[in-house]
């Protein structure tokens, strides 16, 4: 499990990138502020995860789903997050589906190419 409380923090690079994206370019953030934001984000993530785990357990689920997270956010009075998260979730699912289809398509075309190459090689080897 977790040995130190610092192990629960989100990566500093991720936090730094999020801060940079959220603020104007002219804004600067001290190291202490970055550390505080990182800790707050980690605590929030743990809180939502813990609450979602309890919700899933109540519903006899072993796995937390996106639906559990969204419902938990609503119950915790963070319902203003739900519309944008739902939209982001739809985009994520679409990207995953497209990648999966692309991978399957690539695999099918490779299989077809291998079959064609094999048939060509067999035809070339056949005695006349």
UniProtKB/Swiss-Prot annotation:
Its main location: nucleus. One of its GO terms (biological process) is heterochromatin formation. Keywords: Nucleus. GO terms for cellular component: ATAC complex; CHRAC; epsilon DNA polymerase complex. CDD domains: HFD_POLE3_DPB4. Residues 111-128 have a biased composition (Low complexity). Residues 98-110 have a biased composition (Basic and acidic residues). InterPro entries: CBFA_NFYB_domain, DNA_Pol-Epsilon_Subunit, Histone-fold. The keyword Nucleotidyltransferase does not apply. GO terms for molecular function: chromatin DNA binding; protein heterodimerization activity. It is found in: Nucleus. Residues 98-128 are annotated as: Disordered. Homodimer. Component of the DNA polymerase epsilon complex consisting of four subunits: the catalytic subunit PolE1/DNApol-epsilon255 and the accessory subunits PolE2/DNApol-epsilon58, Chrac-14/DNApolE3 and PolE4. Component of the chromatin accessibility complex (CHRAC), composed of Chrac-14, Chrac-16, Acf and Iswi. Forms an heterodimer with Chrac-16. The Chrac-14/Chrac-16 heterodimer interacts with Acf (via N-terminus). Interacts directly with Iswi and this interaction is further stabilized by association with Chrac-16. Accessory component of the DNA polymerase epsilon complex. Participates in DNA repair and in chromosomal DNA replication. Histone-like protein which promotes nucleosome sliding of ATP-dependent nucleosome remodeling complexes. Part of the chromatin-accessibility complex (CHRAC) which uses energy/ATP to increase the general accessibility of DNA in chromatin. As a heterodimer with Chrac-16, binds DNA and facilitates nucleosome sliding by Acf. Has a role in DNA damage response by preventing cid mislocalization to chromatin. PANTHER family: DNA POLYMERASE EPSILON SUBUNIT 3. This is DNA polymerase epsilon subunit 3. It comes from Drosophila melanogaster.
